[in-house]
Amino acid sequence: MADGNTPNTGVAHDQLRSIVERIERLEEEKAALANDIKEVYAEAKGNGFDTKTLRQVVRIRKQDKAERQEQEAILELYLSALGMA
């Protein structure tokens, strides 16, 4: 292990500090975006939309078509097995 007097230690220290600072900035941006999303959902709720359903729609839209169809088929199978379909 290198002692604290080698030139590489300073470089590693600077790189580590840079990485940590970048992560901290991104975490701040992530928190700001999460707050913005929360405000949009609050606006939607104020306009009479069901936020739970909106979240489900957003989650479904992220899926590709095949994945969505597979999950819908499994859900239909389970509901049918329970006599709910």
From Swiss-Prot:
Domain of life: Bacteria
Stretches of the chain forming a coiled coil according to its record: none
Pfam families on file: GapR_DNA-bd
GO molecular function, one term: DNA binding
Name assigned to this protein: UPF0335 protein Plav_2034
Family label: Belongs to the UPF0335 family.
